[in-house]
Amino acid sequence: MAPPTPHLAVRGSDGTLLLHGPPNCQESSAFQRDDRQGRYMTFSNDGTLFAWCNGSQVTVLKVPSGDLVKSFDLPKTTALEFSPLNKVLATWQQYTKTQDNPQGEANLQLWDLQTGACMKAFYQKKMTGWCPSWADDESISVRNVNNELHFFENNNFETIANKLHLQKVSEFALSPGSQPSKVAVYVPGSKGAPSFVRLYQYPNFGGPTCALANKSFFKADKVNMLWNKKATAVLVTASTEVDKTGASYYGEQTLHYVATNGESAVVQLPKNGPIYDVSWSPNSTEFCVVYGFMPAKATVFNNKCESVFDFGTGPRNAAFYSPQGHILVLAGFGNLRGQMEVWDVKKYKQVSKPQAEDTTHFSWCPDGEHIVTATCSPRLRASNGYKIWHYTGTVLYKHETPSGKELWEVLWQPFPAGVFPERAVKYQALPSELGSTEAKPAQAYRPPALRNKPQTASSKLHEEEPPQNMKPGAAGEKQPSKAALKNQKRREAKKAAKQENKPDEAPPPAADPAPVSHVTSSCGDPETDKKIKNLKKKLKAIDELKEQQAAGKVMQKNQLEKMQKEAQLLKELEDLELGL
């Protein structure tokens, strides 16, 4: 049976519609376009239901048939979400008070999608974190109420089944996946005490000793907590509003890894600067981080926080794994030019490098073959529209919003895991009438005084770093064999011996210093890099002693002992470099 075709929901000033995904890319005939301005829209987790509000009512339809499920007379609704099993629809509207009703009305409402009845209404003044978080099987749900977590079981919102009360719970994240459910909580520091993140397994909330893991840290005004798909670890990005050192306008960020087995670590990032994005691979064993002052670095780490692959530097601030995890897109949106780097994750080979200028939204289609990029208001009010691409860089469909109209949101219909299996990665761009938009290499600005002179390394504003595989002996990475290294060292030794035998010859005219024979490399391990650097320093000192000896200088005992250690040092250096 052929896999289904995902729909793309489009919301703007001219209404809400559903579009068939590629290859057709036509408006769905089963869904009648709503010409009224849509305030919000969402799909259910399995993609079988679609809901939107238009300032008059909230409507829920089946997808792809378009059959009506329920409609609710809720003209003020500005946000809505489905529970994971489609049993509950949560709606939220702005909290308001009147003279007749100084307490205001309960503005968070939970609706039974079977009967259409209101199950429970809560007061929720802030839109941030307005929706309850459900476990995937809806056995529990949780809300943050006055810095205290309230847990409900089996959608019974009349009774609080459990509470988690710490000093002041600011943020929480409920784990995905099967039972038992886990929750990550963040408590900001106060009165000199550090902030901390703790992981608990529901319902074991008996105190600090019941926590699965605990990570304390300073310098945190806010955090972002991201569970992996298997709920075995959380990545915590801790941020401060102001960088007291003055190094960054964005404040300071640190990345922490916290696992449910109690392990925790600070993820060491080789380049200073902000952390732009963190993304878990769907395999839950690797994650990608985009970080550092521009041009930013991007690195994939494993669950031991070790570097797996370094993508070098580039104009990027976001990372997006495909739903199957076989492709990674590194992109530079917002104030960057919209360059996208598409990588085959298994081979760590670049597939394409298209460019989508003025992009404010990017998302993967559930099939893992297509993506959508969009320019939306209010982030950017000019040139609104969206494009559907194949990941090889081909534009398959393009829509430009008419003048005077605005595009507000595009949203792919989700599907359960396993509906779209992983396909082999293609490197050849698909044919299309719209073609592809490969990024053209832009010429760097050069001052007039340097324009007629050859470009040197020192004339570059930023040092560029190429991609490098951090795994030893990784596929596609050519490393010199031991025999090749020995032959190279033997040739260098013969050349040095010839030079020693000609001490009386006039020295050749001064020239540019030759490059050091040992190529500077990085293994991602600061300790190993330090050892390599020290060994090279010692070998350089031995070379200088040999030159002095060849010139007739009498060597002292300690200098001769140093020279005798050359072979041993070369062997140590060879072992360390081969271990990269």
UniProtKB/Swiss-Prot annotation:
Under SUPFAM superfamilies, the record lists:
DPP6 N-terminal domain-like (SSF82171)
The protein's GO terms of the molecular function aspect are: mRNA binding; ribosome binding; translation initiation factor activity; tRNA binding
Question: What Gene3D superfamilies does this protein map onto?
Answer: YVTN repeat-like/Quinoprotein amine dehydrogenase (2.130.10.10)
Q: Where is this region: Disordered?
A: 435-530
Pfam families, sorted: eIF2A
- Keyword Repeat listed: yes
Which pairs of positions does the record mark as disulfide bonds? none
WD repeats: from-to residues: 21-62, 72-121, 270-311, 355-399
Q: List the coiled-coil residues.
A: 481-578
GO BP terms: namely: regulation of translation
UniProt lists compositionally biased (Basic and acidic residues) regions at 494-505
Task: Keywords in alphabetical order, please.
Answer: Coiled coil, Initiation factor, Protein biosynthesis, Repeat, Translation regulation, WD repeat
InterPro entries found in the cross-reference section: TIF2A, TIF_beta_prop-like, WD40/YVTN_repeat-like_dom_sf
Instruction: Report if keyword Repeat is assigned.
Output: yes
Cite a GO CC annotation.
Answer: cytosolic small ribosomal subunit
Q: What does this protein do?
A: Functions in the early steps of protein synthesis of a small number of specific mRNAs. Acts by directing the binding of methionyl-tRNAi to 40S ribosomal subunits. In contrast to the eIF-2 complex, it binds methionyl-tRNAi to 40S subunits in a codon-dependent manner, whereas the eIF-2 complex binds methionyl-tRNAi to 40S subunits in a GTP-dependent manner.
Protein family: Belongs to the WD repeat EIF2A family.
Q: What is this protein called?
A: Eukaryotic translation initiation factor 2A
